[in-house]
A protein has these predicted regions:
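Short, structured beta-strand/loop micro-motifs enriched in basic residues and often containing a Trp
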Residues: 1-9
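Feature captures the catalytic cores and cofactor-binding loops of soluble hydro-lyases/lyases
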Residues: 31-159
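Active-site/ligand-binding-proximal alpha/beta "capping" segment
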Residues: 88, 164-184
Length: 184
């Protein structure tokens, strides 16, 4: 099935999604990679406020390239999500609902997705130019010293994504190959 979602999202918004479904995501999406995640953990440890509200948020694991004249953003392909695994459950427990990246996630992330009624969506790796076409606006909102890893607020329209982990424990990276092998 294909769904259209607009952020911020609630667990009820995400409940119908199943691993393998496609999503056209619109609204505000925040960018945060490895270093931004580390800074968020440090801020939380110190009791500081994060640069954006986590409740219902979508976080895209991306470090976009510089934009060309007349463009909003350069190439915006996903980075490997596993590097955020140690930090993602905490953000999910604090209200983050959508993670966007590529690659498998660990058992703790999967459990946190189910516990919080969240989802993990895959962006098409190697298609940064395609992903960039969805971005309408961009603003650096935190840690500009991190360069491409600074936290950005993106406004996106119909960003094409695939549900990998759903709120019911579905995992496309496990179910997809199993279904393929069973059909052979």
């Amino acid at each position: 099935m294909q769904y259209e979602l607009t952020t911020p999202c609630t667990a009820a918004d995400l409940a119908p999604l199943k691993a393998g479904d496609t999503v056209l995501l619109s609204g505000v999406v925040y960018t945060a990679r490895d270093q931004a995640h580390k800074r968020m953990m440090e801020a939380l440890d110190k009791g500081e406020t994060l640069p954006f509200a986590l409740e219902g948020s979508a976080i895209y694991y991306v470090g976009p390239t510089p934009e060309r004249p007349g463009e909003v953003i350069g190439s915006a392909g996903p980075t490997t999500s596993g590097r955020m695994d140690a930090m993602s459950p905490r953000l999910l427990d604090l209200g983050n609902k959508i993670m966007i990246g590529k690659g498998k996630r660990d058992a703790a992330v999967k459990a946190a997705v189910v516990r919080n009624g969240a989802v993990y969506l895959a962006a098409l790796g190697g298609a940064g130019a395609l992903m960039a076409k969805s971005v309408q606006t961009l603003e650096v909102i935190a840690w500009p010293d991190l360069g491409c890893e600074a936290v950005r607020r993106l406004t996106v329209q119909d960003m094409p994504l695939t549900v990998v982990l759903d709120a019911h424990g579905g995992d496309l990276y496990e179910e997809g190959p199993a279904a393929y092998l069973a059909a052979r």
